[in-house]
């Protein structure tokens, strides 16, 4: 066979774990934490035994769903090139990915926020899924401080939360009504406000 021959593409089927995570995402989006493992297993086309074999509990499955939700945001931070540090370019890219992710999963995020969860479960999910993402963002901003681009006296933990909060608020707002400005205009404003607030030379 010629080396230039284009191989036929095969589309791999989702694994059982992937099907369960997708089914859980859909069920949690509709029913919140009240969704049962039986409902999730049925939606994924597997039995409950398989669900428990792969994830042990509904709580661990919920954690896997949150991991899925934050994956794109984590990958966006992984793509940042610290050797070619350009804070405006990087923050614009990260803001867009964060907005797209929150918009894509807004039904899940709204429903989970509306349901009261066990505090220990919330703490575990934050520690295992959300905190690593925050730490990546904090490390990036710390590099900006090291380079003298970001104000040295800035506490980076609330800085990250303020940035993500602006974006999440926009997604929630657009779920209620459509503002007269575009999402692109809002994100550009968020980036300007953020950089003007944290940079030594905006």
PLM regions: where:
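Basic, helix-initiating cap at the start of DNA-binding domains
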Residues: 1-34, 38-43, 49, 59-60
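Amphipathic alpha-helical segments that line or abut small-molecule/effector binding pockets
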Residues: 22, 88-110, 157, 161, ...
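Amphipathic alpha-helical segments enriched in hydrophobic/aromatic and basic residues
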Residues: 28, 36-37, 58, 62-69, ...
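Short helix-capping/turn signature of helix-turn-helix
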Residues: 55, 113-119, 129
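Amphipathic alpha-helical linker/stalk segments
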Residues: 65-94, 102
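Amphipathic C-terminal alpha-helical segment
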Residues: 100-101, 139-143, 160-181, 194-202
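Amphipathic alpha-helical packing segments from all-alpha helical-bundle domains
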Residues: 103-104, 120-147, 157-161, 188
């Amino acid at each position: 066979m010629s080396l230039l021959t284009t191989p036929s593409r095969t589309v791999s089927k989702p694994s059982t774990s992937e099907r369960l995570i997708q089914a859980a995402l859909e069920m949690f989006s509709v029913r919140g934490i009240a969704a049962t493992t039986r409902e999730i297993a049925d939606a994924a086309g597997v039995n409950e035994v398989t669900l428990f074999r792969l994830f042990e509990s509904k709580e661990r499955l919920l954690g896997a769903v949150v991991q899925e939700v934050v994956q794109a945001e984590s990958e966006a931070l992984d793509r940042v090139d610290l050797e070619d540090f350009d804070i405006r370019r990087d923050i614009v890219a990260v803001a867009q990915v964060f907005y797209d992710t929150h918009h894509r999963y807004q039904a899940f995020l709204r429903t989970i926020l509306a349901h009261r969860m066990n505090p220990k479960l919330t703490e575990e999910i934050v520690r295992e899924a959300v905190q690593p993402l925050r730490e990546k963002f904090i490390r990036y901003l710390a590099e900006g401080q090291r380079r003298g681009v970001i104000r040295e006296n800035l506490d980076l933990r609330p800085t990250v939360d303020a940035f993500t909060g602006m974006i999440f608020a926009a997604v929630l707002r657009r779920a209620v009504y459509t503002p007269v400005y575009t999402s692109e205009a809002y994100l550009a404003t968020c980036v300007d406000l953020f950089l003007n607030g944290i940079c030594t030379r905006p």
